[in-house]
Amino acid sequence: MTLPPQPSRLKPPRNTSSLSLRWRVMLLAMSMVAMVVVLMSVAVYAVVSRALYDDIDNQLHSRARLLIESGSLAADPGKAIEGTAYSDVNAMLVNPGRSIYTANQQGQTLPLGEAEKDVISGELLLSLRTANHQRILAVHLTNGSSLLISKSLAPTGQVLGRLGTVLLIVGGVGVAVAAIAGGMVARAGLRPVGRLTQAAERVARTDDLRPIPVFGSDELARLTEAFNMMLRALTESRERQARLVSDAGHELRTPLTSLRTNVELLMASQAPGAPRLPEEEMAGLRADVIAQIEELSTLVGDLVDLTRDEAGGVVYETVDMAEVVDRSLERVRRRRNDIEFDVNVVGWQVYGDAAGLARAVLNLLDNAAKWSPPGGRVGVRLTQTDPVHAELVVSDQGPGIPEAERRLVFERFYRSTAARAMPGSGLGLAIVKQVVLKHGGALRVEDTVPGGNPPGTSFYVMLPGRPLTPGGNGTAPVPAAQFDPDMRSAGSRADRRVIKNTETNGKSRSASKEL
């Protein structure tokens, strides 16, 4: 018997405070100061109160000691007790014969309780307690008499009351000052956050991406610097987007205009009563239309590749570069069967975007084939340079690239004066650069034959990865985070690919010689 599924318990959303950060900082400072003030006030009140009560006890003991040691209680007890009336204490002397001598302050009487009675009866020698707002000391003397002295606590209570009032006022002022200071500190400290907020709102409303001034070197200053970096990145992104749209529009306009002209001419020639164009011209127009459509398709495909890489969401997998080179060579050979390809490729695996790597290699080979003269040779070499890097070199025997233009050839839509007469979108090498950098590689351009005529062009692409050993599955140690762990039988596949490239190479050489 299966139980029905239990409904999932959703956690209630957390309550978020509606108070601003400034108010929260101020309230926090005020609360902390209030807590400290309360603790300090309680401590001060307790210490002062204890000191005052100890002082009263000391006074009572001193008076009793003075009366006892002076001998006046034995000589003239009545006079001795009456003399205390001129001080601030109440006194009583109880003799064994039950004669009692008292002297009280105006409006006061010395209270007698169980403790005092025990002292008078001799059960206790000393008693000290508080009763009826008085501090009472009872002492049993050696002659059997008992001396009782008390002091009013009213003056002490007044002092403690004034102390409590002062502490309350001082504490309240301290809390108020803490609240004001906390508000000022929060306002000053959060001023950079306010500037960041205003800048973010300004960016959301307008296209104003001006950086924010940075003051100091604290955490808020670093936050401002990070925000400025984000603004600069956003500015560059918008500039690249605007430049891409502008360049794409310009590049699309030319083939579209030519295509429209040719289509309109073909339509006009087919209109009733219109003069017929010669068949040769019609065939030329149709060929131009097909070529222009292919040019548009290539341009749109390159744009899609660029935007796909920038948008992200690419699936990474283990890519065998030997297979990528092999497939790219097959496509290029179909377009240029009049040139020779000299291929030397080792087994090498890269963890990355398979489609992007294939497009980058194809663009390099297409570029080399496009600039190679009939009967020329294109070199393709993939060699391992260190345990975790391999270098792909694509060389041609073309006119070469001037040193001043070598950095520009990787820019979008850049085409040199010599390249404008050749087919292409100006995006191929830009895609190569984007793919290589995305995979943590590097690339450079050099002459194939420095000082030669023609010098040719060689593209060097460095890619991180790991090798495949021919005839086995051993591999060099590489960081595990970069690659898939399952690499079984990889070496044998690499061996077969190298043989296949060599055989195909031989066929291309013989074919080129026959041509």
UniProtKB/Swiss-Prot annotation:
Residues 1-24, 187-515 are cytoplasmic. Residues 187-239 form the HAMP domain. It is found in: Cell membrane. It comes from the Bacteria. The keyword Hydrolase applies. One of its GO terms (molecular function) is ATP binding. It catalyses: ATP + protein L-histidine = ADP + protein N-phospho-L-histidine. GO terms for cellular component: plasma membrane. This is Signal transduction histidine-protein kinase/phosphatase MprB. It comes from Mycobacterium sp. (strain JLS). The lineage of its organism: Bacteria, Bacillati, Actinomycetota, Actinomycetes, Mycobacteriales.
